[in-house]
């Protein structure tokens, strides 16, 4: 085999070579077809090789592809910032945008701006940004410090701040062994406890993914959770940052996932879907309330990247947003997401390794368990998630490996999040391959004794 000089995620693994993509499909150099059932890393939200996006890329390349942000602004970057500020749900907040290349950078920028917001008002001790366990906000040291993802933190723990402070709203595995609504949203009121312990004078902001992605396989909270979180933040003069890198730009059936709960954040991070994978691009959106002390003070955001506000990327993002709007993809994500969720929930009745199926829009998480009644996970040495992802890929379906389970990490789960352009007959095709995958894994790898021979009703 020819030596590869490319550092890949698993250094001893063989990866197929992608040759081209079309719509929801990717084709390798052996002409094998794959359904992009996860939009890559929940990124390729409008599918592959969309002509309108390619045309926008070419038009901008002929015009100008790079200027440095301290020397020029561009029409494309200005238009994109204005376009994002006009998202209906946040329009009244008059948000300004800081453009970067990745979600990790967007998180870092959000942290810096939140801290600077308080520094400009003479409150330098408000310099901690706290978060939740069972979360993932990025792989840079600052964003990883915020991430309650034990596996990704482990190698660098000596370099990281311990910023995750409260448990996630993980109703399938409630950390308090309670049930909603009798729990009285203890997962949210724990933020109050954490603030009292640390002191509000030391906390700049609280960050959360509206729907937890990689660390929890689409965990979303019970009703009233984010209302309570925002109430607590406002009470203690703490900014609320919503990490919408994975959930934003239509993925959940709303332009922004926070719209499901009607709670408007002070700062929002975006990525992935805002360029749909056609270019590296992310953004930190900052409300007028947060910007005002900086505008009245130093008048500079202490952050910067070489490719920030890149006009080529901005032009691509504008074309992606146009395409989403023209084809009503946010509404279609809601409609087709309900269909996908129903189809996948139907599988759980027949396969006992499926513990929970949860989702909003075209973002669905499937958590696997060794025992459907105790919810006990499989042992780590089984590497069940990797097996399921591998078998699905062999059958022509790409799905996203995620964490879940006890302590939000000792368990197995995947995310299914196809492009927003997927049609119902393509969903049927996706679900059929996933069904074949689970059937094979359960019967041949896990063992026949896991075949579901009694229904939940019989058990009860």
Model-derived features with residue positions:
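Conserved N-terminal phosphate-binding loop of PLP-dependent enzymes in the Aspartate aminotransferase
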Residues: 1-460
């Amino acid at each position: 085999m020819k030596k590869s000089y490319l550092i890949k995620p698993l250094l001893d693994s063989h990866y197929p070579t992608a040759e081209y993509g079309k719509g929801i499909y990717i084709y390798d150099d052996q002409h094998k077809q794959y359904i992009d059932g996860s939009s890559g890393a929940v990124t390729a939200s409008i599918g592959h090789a969309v002509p309108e996006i390619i045309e926008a890329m070419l038009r901008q390349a002929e015009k100008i592809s790079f200027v440095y942000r301290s020397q020029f602004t561009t029409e494309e970057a200005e238009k994109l910032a204005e376009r994002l500020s006009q998202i209906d749900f946040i329009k009244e907040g008059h948000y300004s945008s800081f453009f970067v290349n990745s979600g990790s950078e967007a998180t870092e920028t959000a942290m810096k701006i939140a801290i600077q917001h308080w520094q400009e008002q003479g409150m330098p001790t408000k310099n901690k940004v706290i978060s939740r366990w069972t979360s993932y906000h990025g792989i840079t040291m600052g964003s990883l410090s915020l991430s309650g993802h034990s596996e990704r933190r482990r190698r660098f723990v000596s370099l990281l701040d311990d910023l995750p402070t409260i448990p996630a709203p993980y109703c399938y595995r409630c950390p308090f062994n309670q049930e909603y609504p009798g729990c009285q949203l203890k997962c949210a009121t724990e933020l109050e406890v954490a603030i009292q312990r640390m002191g509000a004078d030391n906390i700049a902001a609280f960050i959360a993914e509206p729907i937890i992605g990689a660390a929890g396989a689409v965990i979303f909270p019970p009703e009233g959770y984010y209302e309570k979180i925002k109430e607590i933040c406002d009470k203690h003069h703490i900014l609320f940052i919503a990490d919408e890198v994975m959930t934003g730009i239509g993925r959940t059936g709303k332009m922004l996932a926070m719209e499901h709960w009607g709670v408007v954040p002070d700062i929002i991070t975006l990525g992935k879907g805002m360029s749909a994978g056609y270019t590296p691009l992310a953004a930190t959106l900052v409300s007028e309330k947060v910007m005002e002390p900086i505008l009245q003070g130093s008048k500079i955001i202490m952050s910067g990247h070489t490719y920030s506000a890149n006009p080529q990327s901005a032009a691509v993002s504008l074309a992606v947003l146009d395409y989403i709007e023209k084809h009503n993809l946010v509404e279609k994500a809601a409609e087709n997401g309900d269909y996908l969720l129903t189809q996948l929930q139907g599988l759980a009745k027949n396969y006992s390794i499926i513990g929970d199926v949860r989702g909003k829009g075209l973002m669905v998480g499937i958590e696997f368990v060794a025992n459907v009644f105790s919810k006990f996970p499989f042992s780590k040495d089984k590497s069940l998630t990797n097996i399921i992802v591998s078998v699905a890929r062999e059958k022509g379906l790409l799905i996203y490996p995620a964490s879940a389970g006890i302590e939000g990490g000792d368990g197995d789960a995947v995310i299914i999040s196809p492009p927003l352009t997927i049609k119902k007959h393509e969903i049927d095709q996706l679900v059929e391959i996933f069904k074949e995958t689970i059937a094979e894994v359960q019967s041949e790898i896990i063992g026949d004794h896991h075949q579901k021979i009694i229904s939940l009703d019989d058990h009860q």
